[in-house]
């Protein structure tokens, strides 16, 4: 079998380790500015984009596909229209209007976007075996990096679900499912941010990873694990939060599903060493866990009940934005002690995604 892993040398490993920064969504070192908060709402039929103003969530909205993800980069807001639409749109945050929208092939399912440089972004495609670089000015694809070598078995895609950036390195998180089953642990791949050249890969400790983030110079990865017979997740050691050791090229558990109460559906990291995890027990039962990564301790935030509507941490204000889709659903702002609900119009759809634009 042809060897497909391009192993980085010891010197290059050391380089991208020392290049790590807490601001994992930016490719430069500009100081963080106060952010504008956007919220995406969705039900079974439609989706809408709103924004937070002085009075709460806006009355005005922009319509998008119901399964969309929103991400802010350099004053712009990217809308990733996913299953059933497969589009990428750029919203001008100064006007709250769509600047352009481009189509991907059916089923390519854009899953994440990060800054490549001041003129381009990298876009993850969960439903296709590739990462694409896209021009910010018009949405045109400028480069394609194939990832089919990471496909599991007969699968046609390695299921790229999350991207992150540290220094000049692009990190890609692959679930590697096959026929809707997770037979092997997830995979972390490192690329040159500038041109997508593969540097190295590391096999993760657990199956079905969902998200990653940097804290105290370390990369943490959250995993949902395999589903049980009722399509929930078990409180066992087959899932949880792990930390990557780049020097040893391995990943080990920090806290598992026993402590958390289940697998991690969504994940946000305070760069100072606290992780917030949406613990998916079963449909509608998704509590918020606050994890001290150094102490490996877990506490449950009691003010919310179903945080499947997204988690985003604001590095500047030191607060966590929470999308709760439970009985007291809405957009919440958590200061580390208390979660406060932000006022919203009565016709606003349940929160499905949150983004910060600065």
Question: Where are the model-predicted features located?
Answer:
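Short glycine/acidic-enriched loop and turn motifs that connect beta-strands
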Residues: 43-46, 84-86, 127-130, 177-181, ...
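Repeated scaffold domains used in trafficking and secretory/extracellular systems
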Residues: 64-75, 108-116, 155-164, 204-215, ...
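A short beta-strand motif characteristic of beta-propeller blades
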Residues: 55-63, 97-104, 140-154, 197-203, ...
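Bacterial Sec-dependent N-terminal signal peptides
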Residues: 1-41
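Conserved beta-propeller blade signature
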Residues: 36-40, 76-80, 120-123, 170-172, ...
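Asp-box/WD-like beta-propeller blade repeats and closely related beta-sheet repeat scaffolds
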Residues: 107-114, 124-132, 136-164
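Short, conserved, GDST-rich strand-edge loop motifs in beta-rich repeat architectures
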Residues: 32, 173-185, 222-238
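Beta-propeller blade signature
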Residues: 185-193, 236-246, 288-292
């Amino acid at each position: 079998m042809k060897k497909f892993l391009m192993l980085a040398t010891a010197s290059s490993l050391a380089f991208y380790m020392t290049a790590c920064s807490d601001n994992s969504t930016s490719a430069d070192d500009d100081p963080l500015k106060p952010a504008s908060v956007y919220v995406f709402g969705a039900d079974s039929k439609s989706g809408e984009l709103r924004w937070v103003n002085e009075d709460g969530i806006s009355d005005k909205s922009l319509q998008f596909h119901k399964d969309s993800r929103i991400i802010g980069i350099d004053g712009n807001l990217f809308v990733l229209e996913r299953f059933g639409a497969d589009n990428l749109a750029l919203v001008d945050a100064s006007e709250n209007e769509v600047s352009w929208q481009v189509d991907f092939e059916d089923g390519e399912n854009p899953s994440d976007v990060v800054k490549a440089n001041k003129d381009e972004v990298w876009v993850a495609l969960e439903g296709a075996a590739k990462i694409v670089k896209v021009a910010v000015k018009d949405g045109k694809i400028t480069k394609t990096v194939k990832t089919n070598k990471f496909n599991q078995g007969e699968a046609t895609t390695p299921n790229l679900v999350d991207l992150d950036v540290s220094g000049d390195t692009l990190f890609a998180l692959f679930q590697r499912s096959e026929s809707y089953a997770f037979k092997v642990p997830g995979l972390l791949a490192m690329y040159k941010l500038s041109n997508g050249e593969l540097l190295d890969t590391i096999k993760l400790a657990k199956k079905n990873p969902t998200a990653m983030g940097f804290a105290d110079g370390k990369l943490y990865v959250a995993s949902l694990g395999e589903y049980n017979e009722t399509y929930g997740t078990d409180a066992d050691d087959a899932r949880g939060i792990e930390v990557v050791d780049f020097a040893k090229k391995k990943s080990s558990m920090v806290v598992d599903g026993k402590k958390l109460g289940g697998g991690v559906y969504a994940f946000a990291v305070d760069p100072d060493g606290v992780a917030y995890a949406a613990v998916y027990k079963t449909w509608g039962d998704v509590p918020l866990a606050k994890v001290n990564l150094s102490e490996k301790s877990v506490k449950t935030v009691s003010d919310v009940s179903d945080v499947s509507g997204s988690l985003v941490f604001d590095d500047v204000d030191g607060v966590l934005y929470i999308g709760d889709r439970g009985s007291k659903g809405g957009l919440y702002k958590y200061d580390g002690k208390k979660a406060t609900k932000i006022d919203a119009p009565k016709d606003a759809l349940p929160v499905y995604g949150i983004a910060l634009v600065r």
